Amino acid sequence: MNTNEYQNRNQPNTGLSRRTMLGLSAVAATGMLLVPGALASPGMRRVVVWSEGTASKDEGSKEVYPQDINTAVAEGLKPLAGWEIITATLDDPDQGVGEERLQGTDVLIWWGHKRHGDVKRELVDRINKRVREEGMGFIALHSSHFAEPFKKLMGTQCSWGEYVADGTSAQIIVKEPNHPICKGVKDFSLPKIERYGEPFKVPTPEAVPLDGIYTKPNGDTKPGRMGLCWTVGKGRVFYFTPGHETYNDFFRPEVRLILCNAVEWAAPKA
């Protein structure tokens, strides 16, 4: 898979950080691959990046994510050393996360939007068990606050107070610089973001490493939480607010670094 294809077509002109470039070089040296459907290699940890498969088909998003959001997220995880990165979609066999694959997964990243109700209850229950009883990490992105696995883990409605896509911009603020998810991350701006307004109906998080300030088109500002963490049973859960399908958030170096850090943080600890 040609990483430059994504950088040239979709990334903002900020360039990759030195850390990311070094990580990508290490990937090339070690031969770690982005695999659409294999079992984990011995001695490697596994992260599965799941999406429902609509972003590459819908008008307004297919130009941004022509190979879908899961591929963009997975490309951004390549600097992770010792990880096998697998993409999966709702339309794959077993909805992308069969029992054998799930049992070998250390962290599951989830992006859903329109097809939350199509995810089978049995899969939701298996994911819930893997997190609560066996310590698998779970990362929910943007509209996945309504994903059935995330709602099952939270045990609440998981709704935001408002949803507005009106040209709002956002400043992402590192609130807890010593949190592992914030390692190497500096405050940054997103020129456009779908505004998710408080309150967010979830359990009180144990940490909010990333905060934010929304700036509306009229100049008014509103605070909003951008990254929230929980421990659910034996597992760790992270929710990341940005990631609307018509914006190129998942090609931004800052977002990719956050997600790399989140995978390491959420992974089961020996």
Where are these regions (language model features)?
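Catalytic beta-strand/loop cores that center a nucleophilic Ser/Cys/Thr
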Residues: 42, 84, 160-239
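Short alpha-beta junction capping motif
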Residues: 50, 101-149, 234
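Aromatic-Pro/Gly-enriched surface loop or interdomain linker
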Residues: 37-104
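N-terminal secretory signal peptides
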Residues: 1-16
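Short, solvent-exposed loop/turn segments at secondary-structure junctions
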Residues: 54-55, 93, 115, 145-146, ...
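Short catalytic/ligand-binding loop motif for oxyanion handling, primarily in non-cytosolic enzymes
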Residues: 57-58, 94-96, 117-118, 140, ...
